[in-house]
Amino acid sequence: MAQPRYDDGLHGYGMDSGAAAAAMYDPHAGHRPPGLQGLPSHHSPHMTHAAAAAATVGMHGYHSGAGGHGTPSHVSPVGNHLMGAIPEVHKRDKDAIYEHPLFPLLALIFEKCELATCTPREPGVQGGDVCSSESFNEDIAMFSKQIRSQKPYYTADPEVDSLMVQAIQVLRFHLLELEKVHELCDNFCHRYISCLKGKMPIDLVIDERDTTKPPELGSANGEGRSNADSTSHTDGASTPDVRPPSSSLSYGGAMNDDARSPGAGSTPGPLSQQPPALDTSDPDGKFLSSLNPSELTYDGRWCRREWSSPADARNADASRRLYSSVFLGSPDNFGTSASGDASNASIGSGEGTGEEDDDASGKKNQKKRGIFPKVATNILRAWLFQHLTHPYPSEDQKKQLAQDTGLTILQVNNWFINARRRIVQPMIDQSNRAVYTPHPGPSGYGHDAMGYMMDSQAHMMHRPPGDPGFHQGYPHYPPAEYYGQHL
């Protein structure tokens, strides 16, 4: 039953006794008295088959070298005898292992360990469960049924029996450890891929969506739309995805106002000439509305938005939120009436536009309140425009404003710092550059400078800074990019 395949690959576990350990680690083990070379019951788990053979040959060499005199022989005759006796003892030990009843089971689990080490673990691979530990349990049950009817498990040599059992146990533990390592690797790969998908740049996600997008959106004009979308790279369906999460709060209401104003933050393109109303009976129109719901206003009017880049969209949205936060009370209530907010702020602004009043009910449910309460913002704005000559409160005034608004002194302080930089300073620059004050007053302003600023403030109330008409009336007013953050 000799199998040369396992001649050099098998390692024995627990076959050797104390004499074998002495022969392996002690060079003078062959010279010990025979009384110290008894075989204890303990089996070392690290002894190899070759070490056991060397130990056995060492014992034979001791007796042959000692002769009948009882004295240890010289080292060189024993070494010569060992060189000639190793092949015979080695062959006898190999035969004892190969002919053991448990050897087929040992060879089976050894092959399973090899397969578990080198086989790729993919869910679609056929036969991937052949090298699992559970399959080995089935193999043990089947093997026990077969061998029970033929011959017993153990032989007359308890040392070889112990070697086989412990070798099978060690390989079984090794198979379980391999499975655990594979499970940990699979878990790590799954979590790592999920993390990468969560942190993937949004432009890659948009490109992936564009690749999966159907090439045809309809017949006739649908083909023209798809060609224009592929060249513009600013499709309305992907525009909300380009914006960061912080700027997506105003999506749904403020964007529609901007879309209805001609050229507000947009670039005229081939798709800007669309019918004012969408025919709901048109199946192509329904399909387009389902793809691009952001292009329709709340009452169904078609409004196509095209920005030259995502940065322009963010700048226009930031300017809109600044306008609503400064002049309308809070950054997330852009659809409310301008007249009511301005009257609460004690600023002469005129009546709000009818378009804003129409959209108030539709946007009220889509918006969230800002960081500061609306009443507190109105109080702070009223104080600011009442003290434009020195638009910064003292410590006592800060405390009083904090009590009136319910804010902390630090919040009041930060609000006035931002307001002085973003509201008052542009107004002062506009007043100084305007050729409107022939008689400067004692404070550097003209006699009518305050009225001029208040009138200009009233005109600015009617449209957000992102509107080009806003900058046509006030050429020196900072552009929309100036308002990177709302107050």
From Swiss-Prot:
InterPro entries: HD, Homeodomain-like_sf, KN_HD, PKNOX/Meis_N, TALE_homeobox. One of its GO terms (cellular component) is nucleus. Residues 365-427 bind DNA. In the wing disk, the expression is present in the regions corresponding to notum, wing hinge and ventral pleura. In the leg disk, the expression is in the periphery region, corresponding to the proximal segments of the legs. In the antennal disk, the expression is in all but the arista region. In the eye disk, the expression is strong in the anterior region surrounding the eye field, including the regions corresponding to ptilinum, ocellus and head capsules, and weak in the posterior and lateral margins of the eye disk. Keywords: Developmental protein, DNA-binding, Homeobox, Nucleus. GO terms for biological process: animal organ morphogenesis; brain development; compound eye development; compound eye photoreceptor fate commitment; embryonic pattern specification; eye development; haltere morphogenesis; head morphogenesis. It holds the Pfam family Homeobox_KN. Residues 227-237, 333-345 have a biased composition (Polar residues). Residues 127-211 form the MEIS N-terminal domain. GO terms for molecular function: cis-regulatory region sequence-specific DNA binding; DNA binding; DNA-binding transcription activator activity, RNA polymerase II-specific; DNA-binding transcription factor activity; DNA-binding transcription factor activity, RNA polymerase II-specific; DNA-binding transcription factor binding; protein heterodimerization activity; transcription coactivator binding. Disruption phenotype: Severe head defects, including a failure of head involution and transformation of the thoracic and abdominal segments into a more posterior identity. Residues 25-49, 210-292, 333-369 are annotated as: Disordered. It is found in: Nucleus. Transmembrane segments: none annotated. Interacts with exd; required for nuclear translocation of exd. All isoforms are required for patterning of the embryonic cuticle. Acts with exd to delimit the eye field and prevent inappropriate eye development. Isoforms that carry the homeodomain are required for proper localization of chordotonal organs within the peripheral nervous system and antennal identity; required to activate antennal-specific genes, such as sal and to repress the leg-like expression of dac. Necessary for the nuclear localization of the essential HOX cofactor, extradenticle (exd). Belongs to the TALE/MEIS homeobox family. This is Homeobox protein homothorax. It comes from Drosophila melanogaster (Fruit fly).
